[in-house]
């Protein structure tokens, strides 16, 4: 993220928390672990994402940002910028860690989303996310940009692919061109597109379509102002269709399965919010992102993370935060038209944020989040459900709280993330325990 970001999230440090109803039994959790995986104090290293190769579960990719911050981060901790990268990517770069032995050994390398060598006019990189498809192909989305001219169109989101577990990557494709991007077409837009920021990505494993929603400034025929868009690739990220405007900017984790893509959005200011004007809307496309429909809900708020049940068409879940700070699970079985509250995870004394969801093909629903105390310190928790969100087993993954950030801070800590296998929840998050932002990973086994 290119703007200041603060952390937040979970629950008390009990070994097991049972969700609604309190007497229900959730999955059994064991083998909890955490580990710091980045160590270069010249950079603030956070905003991570994680994916596990379904063809080889020992192959894991973890992406994160190497935040230079014009040298402030390194100088603050006794490591002034001295290498070439610090001068060429003066604000942010994007890196990955890859392992082929389940995390015993990691290899770090720069992701070819952006660099000075690729394009000196937009060398910085941010906002990376990673996922694997069922064939073992990895996809990473990220931004390349120049600061501060990204605000006027010198920056966009791009996608790269890897066919060898993250060792090598394809050349990037442009997802939604801005004014100064390759593929820019002001004539077709009848105006301009500029300022790309904070995106999310989903894969429909049934159709193979990739979806990205993000924030983009537009002064064009389809939208005016800071808006949210939905872009679709129907050929594995090689090319992208026109990114359709869907409403007020509020990018959040989206979900796709069985030909349906779904995510939440604030209710329109000019109506369309249904009976509850302070409740979120659900945006749905059933034609591969060519058009969208908007459904009002009775779920308070303006956004909530979404996840798709890969076993059943039209089945999705939303995790929203209620007035008491709990995570409340809502489900739909008709593609977003109607929602039912099915479960709840209490987060006593903390504020849940940076929520990330996953739903395995085996039917395990998972969630991870960071829980912030009133003083700004936080820990990381994960939870899994075997009954579609009615009951959860919750486990703290981080051993101790991270202190809040008290130093110089520019950007680069938007996300935490989880990934489910058939019997494990893996998680990654940014942590300030060493006084510098570093990436941790952890998880647990469930049965």
Model-derived regions, located:
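Secretory targeting and sorting signals
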Residues: 2-24
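C-terminal PAP-associated
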Residues: 25-447
């Amino acid at each position: 993220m290119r703007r200041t970001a603060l952390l937040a999230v979970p629950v008390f440090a009990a070994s097991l928390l049972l969700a609604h109803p309190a007497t229900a039994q959730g999955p059994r959790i064991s083998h909890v672990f955490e580990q710091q995986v980045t160590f270069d104090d010249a950079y603030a290293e956070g905003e991570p994402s994680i994916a596990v190769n379904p063809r080889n579960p020992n192959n894991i990719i973890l992406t994160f940002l190497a935040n230079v911050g014009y040298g402030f981060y390194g100088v603050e901790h006794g490591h002034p910028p001295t290498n070439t990268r610090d001068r060429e990517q003066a604000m942010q770069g994007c890196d990955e860690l890859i392992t082929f032995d389940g995390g015993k050994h990691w290899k770090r390398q720069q992701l070819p989303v952006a660099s000075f060598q690729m394009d000196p006019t937009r060398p910085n990189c941010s906002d990376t996310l990673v996922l694997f498809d069922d064939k073992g192909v990895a996809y990473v989305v990220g931004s390349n940009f120049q600061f501060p001219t990204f605000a006027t169109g010198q920056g966009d989101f791009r996608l790269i692919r890897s066919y060898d577990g993250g060792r090598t990557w394809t050349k990037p494709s442009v997802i939604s061109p801005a004014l100064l991007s390759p593929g820019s077409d002001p004539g077709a837009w009848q105006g301009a597109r500029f300022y790309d920021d904070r995106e999310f990505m989903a894969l429909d494993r049934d159709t193979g379509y990739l979806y990205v929603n993000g924030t983009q400034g537009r002064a064009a025929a389809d939208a005016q102002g800071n808006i949210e868009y939905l872009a679709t690739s129907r050929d594995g990220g090689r090319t992208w269709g026109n990114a359709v405007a869907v409403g007020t900017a509020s990018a959040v984790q989206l979900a796709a399965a069985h030909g349906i893509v779904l995510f939440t959005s604030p209710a329109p200011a000019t109506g369309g919010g249904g009976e509850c004007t302070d409740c979120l809307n659900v945006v749905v496309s059933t034609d591969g992102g060519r058009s969208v429909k908007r459904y009002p809900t009775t779920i308070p708020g303006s956004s909530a993370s979404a996840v798709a049940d890969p076993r059943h068409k039209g089945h999705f879940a939303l995790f929203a935060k209620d007035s008491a700070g709990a995570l409340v699970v809502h489900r739909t079985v008709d593609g977003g038209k109607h929602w039912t509250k099915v479960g709840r995870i209490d987060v006593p004394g903390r504020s849940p944020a940076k929520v990330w969801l996953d739903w395995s093909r085996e039917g395990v629903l998972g969630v991870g989040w960071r829980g912030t105390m009133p003083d700004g310190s936080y820990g990381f928790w994960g939870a899994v459900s075997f009954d579609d969100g009615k009951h959860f087993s919750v486990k703290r993954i981080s051993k101790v709280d991270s202190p809040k950030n008290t130093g110089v801070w520019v950007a680069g800590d938007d996300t935490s993330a989880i990934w489910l296998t058939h019997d494990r929840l893996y998680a990654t998050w940014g942590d300030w325990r060493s006084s510098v932002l570093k990436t941790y990973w952890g998880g647990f086994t469930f049965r």
